Amino acid sequence: MVHWTDFERSTIKDIFAKIDYDCVGPAAFARCLIVYPWTQRYFGNFGNLFNAAAIIGNPNVAKHGITIMHGLERGVKNLDHLTETYEELSVLHSEKLHVDPDNFKLISDCLTIVVASRLGKAFTGEVQAALQKFLAVVVFSLGKQYH
């Protein structure tokens, strides 16, 4: 079980309360597909992913980015039970979708960049540490089925 300080708990909740899922999710997911093009192989049914402009303008990318944000929101609401919270998604991604678990880290890195750009000066080192700790535990939890 992960130990969360009061600061970490409040910071994680505050970040997710401040950001617009409809902007941050699509931006983070699009960034992941652009920066790490090999991740596109899981999304062949999304249509045109041939260049950055196509990815950014793709409604399927936007929709999945929002889905990712709502998935993370589940974790924010269940900080003390993240492994259990993501158990079903871990099974889905490993056994049905066969997603490389390293991709969870890639999207979390892209999300950190997008959140930092949205929060600006409020994204201090301490805030980043809390967010990245949360995302690291989510990544671990999503990859649990692979172990």
Swiss-Prot record:
Any one Gene Ontology BP term: hydrogen peroxide catabolic process
Residues reported to bind heme b: 64, 93
Matches recorded under InterPro entries: Globin (IPR000971), Globin-like_sf (IPR009050), Globin/Proto (IPR012292), Hemoglobin_b (IPR002337), Hemoglobin_oxygen_transport (IPR050056)
Assigned keywords, A-Z: Heme, Iron, Metal-binding, Oxygen transport, Transport
One GO location term (cellular component): blood microparticle
Tissue: Red blood cells.
Gene3D superfamilies in alphabetical order: Globins
Presence of keyword Iron: yes
Globin domain boundaries: 3-147
GO molecular function: haptoglobin binding; heme binding; metal ion binding; organic acid binding; oxygen binding; oxygen carrier activity; peroxidase activity
PROSITE patterns listed in its UniProt record: GLOBIN
Functional note: Involved in oxygen transport from gills to the various peripheral tissues.
The family this protein is said to belong to: Belongs to the globin family.
Additional facts recorded: This fish has two hemoglobins: Hb1 (major) and Hb2. Hb1 has low oxygen affinity, it displays a pronounced Bohr effect, which is enhanced by ATP, and a pronounced Root effect.
Subunit structure: Hb1 is a heterotetramer of two alpha-1 chains and two beta-1 chains.
The protein's name: Hemoglobin subunit beta-1
Source species: Liparis tunicatus (Kelp snailfish)
Gene name per UniProt: hbb1
